[in-house]
UniProtKB/Swiss-Prot annotation:
The keyword Cell membrane does not apply. Belongs to the HesB/IscA family. One of its GO terms (molecular function) is iron ion binding. Required for insertion of 4Fe-4S clusters for at least IspG. InterPro entries: FeS_biogenesis, FeS_cluster_insertion, FeS_cluster_insertion_CS, FeS_cluster_insertion_RrpA, HesB-like_dom_sf. Keywords: Iron, Iron-sulfur, Metal-binding. It comes from Buchnera aphidicola subsp. Schizaphis graminum (strain Sg). Binds 1 iron-sulfur cluster per subunit. The lineage of its organism: Bacteria, Pseudomonadati, Pseudomonadota, Gammaproteobacteria, Enterobacterales. Pfam families: Fe-S_biosyn. Homodimer. Gene3D superfamilies: HesB-like domain. This is Iron-sulfur cluster insertion protein ErpA. PANTHER family: IRON-SULFUR CLUSTER ASSEMBLY 2 HOMOLOG, MITOCHONDRIAL.
Length: 114
């Protein structure tokens, strides 16, 4: 398990604060936000977020403000150099992925191609 690979992927203070808030609501300090990639969407791949207690031996942990983001090595290949942010506006609230590896993204921003 590799810890703090900041050079691989980052998440903003806004994302860290929202993750911390959700974990507090869940009343389970052992959960961590996991981001992973699945096939699907209009562009071929989709970002998925879940709160997970399990950390696999080969998972990568990114820490910020005492919060851990968990990424499996295969998903990291698609997210390398990216940033996870959290945005709240009139349209709603959501985690946003800025992915420098995505050649195309769909209008909703949830699917991409490489």
């Amino acid at each position: 398990m590799e810890k703090n690979p900041i050079k691989y992927i980052e998440f903003t203070n806004s994302a860290a604060k929202k993750i911390k808030s959700i974990i507090k609501e869940k009343k389970n300090k052992n959960v961590k936000l996991r981001i992973y990639i699945i096939g699907g969407g209009c562009s071929g791949f989709q970002y998925q977020f879940i709160f997970d207690e399990k950390i696999n031996e080969d998972d990568i942990l990114v820490k910020k403000l005492n919060i851990c983001l968990v990424i499996d090595p295969i998903s990291l290949q698609y997210l390398h150099g990216g940033t996870i942010d959290y945005l709240e506006n009139l349209e709603g609230s959501k985690f946003i992925v800025s992915n420098p590896n995505a050649k195309n993204t769909c209008g909703c921003g949830l699917s991409f191609s490489i």
